[in-house]
Amino acid sequence: MKVYSCFICFDMKNNKRSLFILKCLMEQSDEKHLVTIANINEYLRQYDLDANRETISDCIKELQEVGYDILCVRSTQNQYCMRERSFSLAEVKLLVDAVQSSRFIPEEQSIELISKLAELVGSHKGEILKRQLYIESRAKTDNPDIMEYVDKIHQAIIENKKIKFRYFEYNANKEKVLRYDGFTYTLSPCVLVWNNDMYYVVGIYKDKEGYSKFRIDRMCDFELTEEKGTESQESLDMSDFFEKEFSMMNGETCEVELLCENKLMGSIVDKFGIDVNTEIVDAEHFKAIVDVNLSGNFYGWVFASKGKMKILTPEWVKSEFQEIVNSYAK
């Protein structure tokens, strides 16, 4: 039996019955699907509870008095529904889409999590969400322990404890191979980061200066230790670490002038923000002056434009990009 967290704050005189009436309204009603007292009584019988019309009506009034938005449509047989919820259908749909598209969450756990999210809007709207469900398992991770690892890492951060784990990669045969012959890492985790559809833990590794990051879906043999974690080094700039590690990676920072076709303005704004420095060149082109980390990611991003974006300055960056392009023709 699932019990909603909001039940904890209740101190109703007829306790159990009132709680299950609320549960019935949350699960089985919405503005388009109202329930009668007979429906509610039928629901109560599933839990070996029973009540007459007057008792159920009194319980609903008490629920309304403590703030639940329960609509009553009066007729010869009154009908009720839970009108307002903590999350709207659109809000839950956004959360469902995020879970659905996340490569980090395994397929089986994605379906389970989406089912729980669907309960937030009641059974009728929840079924609509489930019918629209599409999980592309090909792109999902196959590590079933991720949720447990996330929970333990979060606990380690709160309690300032170290974690231990081994880390795997894939060989040419697509087989999992432990890094460094099964070496066990010990990390003082500082923060969990979701970036580019992957989940990372960032922390302090041994006596290494600065922060280190590890993909959680590549961990195995995970252990939450009782060892006190290393205090976060205040002199280190975590925002600078994020900028270098999670943007265009660890290249040299440089101001670059790009010539772009107008249709790429959306991509430029997405990458650099609405305040990016741009200038109209002609009816079909604009220039963008941006600060980037010169790395394979940046050059790959320019290359992916298929000639619709060109590097104008500096000349040495332009030449370096051309050398990369020429290397593909060899």
Task: Locate predicted features.
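Short, basic/aromatic recognition patches that contact phosphate-bearing ligands
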Residues: 1-98, 180, 327-330
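Short, surface-exposed charged micro-motifs
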Residues: 69-71, 189-191, 277
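General beta-strand recognition
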Residues: 79-81, 164, 200-202, 287, ...
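Bulky hydrophobic/aromatic content
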Residues: 88-174
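Loop-centered beta-sheet repeat module
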Residues: 154-205
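Flexible linker/loop signature enriched in Pro/Ser/Thr and Pro/Gly
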Residues: 207-239
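Polybasic (Lys/Arg-rich)
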Residues: 238-330
